[in-house]
C-alpha cells in the first residue's frame, strides 16, 4: 500500500504543477503533458529553496502548501504574460489521436513490469554502493525536514546538486513511505511515464502530430535497451536517468523557441517562449549537470541548422560563436579527479566491440538489434533528407564518444567524456534520444507513402508491438534483476538478513555516534537505520574524508598500543566499531585497506562489546589519551 501511495504522489508531483502552469499559458494536449515534468521539478526545487530560506520543514505538509502557493502564483503569471503558439500542422480533430496515448500507457506498463519483476519488492536494495549515498542522502533530507537540493552535499560526496534527492524527499514526506520505497516509486514514474511522454512531445515537435509518428516514438521509447534498461542495470544512476529523460521535453521547447526566432515571431512572444527551455534546462541541470552537456551535444546543432535554413545566417553565426565559447567554458571546468576515471575503459578494445556497443544500444537480442540498427540508420538518412541533419549528428556524436572510450587511451578521451564519467553506458543512453527520432522519421516516411490508415494497420501494429514487448520483458528483466539479486554471495553488499541485523544493532547506538565500519561488508548501510556518522560513507578506498581515517582503517586494533593510532582515533571522533559480515568481491582489489577493523575482537584491548546480531558485532571504543 505504501508503494502504491508513493507511486501516486510521485506522479502527481511530476505532472500536476507543470500541467497547471502550462494550461494557464494556453498549452493543451501533448504540449502540456509532455512539457510538464521539467516545470514541475523546477517548482519542487523552488519549494525546497523556500523551505530552506525560511528554515522550516518543507518535506511534509508545509511543503505541499508551499508548492500549491508557488504553482498558483506561477500559473497566474503564465496566464497574464504567455503568448500561445499554435501549431498550424495540427488539425482540430486528428484521426487516431488517442492511439499515441494508448501506446504510452502500454509502453509504460512494459517498463514498469520489467522494473517490478527485476526488483521484486519496493524495499529491495540495489547491491551497489551508489544506493548507499543516493537513498542515504534522501533519508537525511527527510530527517532534517529539508527539500533543498543544496543540502545533499552535506550527506553524500556527490559532485552535483541533489535535485533527484530533493524530489525523492518530497515524495517520501508526502506519501509517508520509507525513502527506499519512495525512491523506487519515483524511479518507476520517471522511466514509465516521464521518459515516453517527453519523447512523444519531441517527435511531435520535429515531425508533426501524425499518429503513426507519435505511436512509433512511444513504442521506441520502451524498446531501446540503452535507455532506460541499460541504466537500470548499471547501478543507482537515478539522477542521471531523470536528467536524461528530461532532455526530450527541454529540447522540444528549445526547437519551438528557435522556430519563433527564425520567423521573427515578435519580442514579447519570443521572451515568453524562452522561459520554458531556460527553466527546464536549469531544473534538469540541478538534477544532474550532464543534462546541460547533453543539451549542447544534441540541441546546439539543431538550433544552428534551423536558423541557417530559415535564412538567419548572421544570427546563426552569433549563436555558433556564443555556443562555441559556452561549450569551451563548460568543458574546461576542472571536474573532481574521480570523474575523470570513474567509468573509463582505458582503450584496448577493437572494432567488433564498437559494433557490439552500437547494436546493444538498440537491443540485447541479436536479431532485433540488427533490425533496429537498420531502422535507426535509415531514419538518420531520412532525417538529413528532410532538413534535420542534427538528428544524425546527435546520434553519431555520443556513439563516437562512447567508442572512443573503448578504443583510445583513457587520458586522451577523458577531457571530452568526463561529463558522462567517461562511461559508455551513459553516452549511449544519450544517443537513444535521437535514435527514437530517427525511427519516428521512418514511420513518417512510410505514413506519407502509404497513408495513415494503411501505415497504422489496426491489427498488425498491436501484434507486432506485443511481440516486441514480450521480447523486451524476456531480455531486459533478468539483467536488471542482477543488480538487486546477485547470483553469487560475493556480489552482495548487504543481504536482507544483514540488513535486519544492522537495523537491530542501530538501536544500540546513540544519536551522533561516529562508527568505523567496513563498507564492503555491509556496514555502510548502518546509517540508513540511525542518525550516525560513518567514517567510511561509501564503497571507496579509505580516503581521508576525516583526519586519520586511513590510519584507523589499517590499524584500529592497535589503539591502545600505538600512540599514532590513538591520535587518529581521537581526531576522527570514532566512538564505535562494527565488525563482521561477508565481504563483497570488490574489496579484494583494496588488499588490507580495512584490516584494522577486521582484527578487532574480544581479546583486543580498548574495545567493549555492546551487542551481536547476525554476522555483526558492535563495539564501543574505550577512551584513549593521545
Task: Kindly give the residue locations of the regions a language model identified.
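Membrane-embedded, hydrophobic transmembrane alpha-helices
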Residues: 1-93
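Extracytoplasmic
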Residues: 9, 15, 471-626
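Membrane-helix boundary/interfacial segments in multi-pass membrane proteins
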Residues: 54-63, 123-127, 176, 226-242, ...
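Active-site lumenal/periplasmic loops and adjacent helix-entry segments of GT-C-fold
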Residues: 108-245, 264, 484-492
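Membrane-interface alpha helices of multi-pass inner-membrane proteins
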Residues: 265-289
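Perimembrane helix-loop-helix junctions
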Residues: 294-322
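Hydrophobic, aromatic-rich transmembrane alpha-helices
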Residues: 302-306, 369-396
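Signature aromatic-anchored transmembrane alpha helix within multi-pass, membrane-resident enzymes
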Residues: 318-326, 444-478
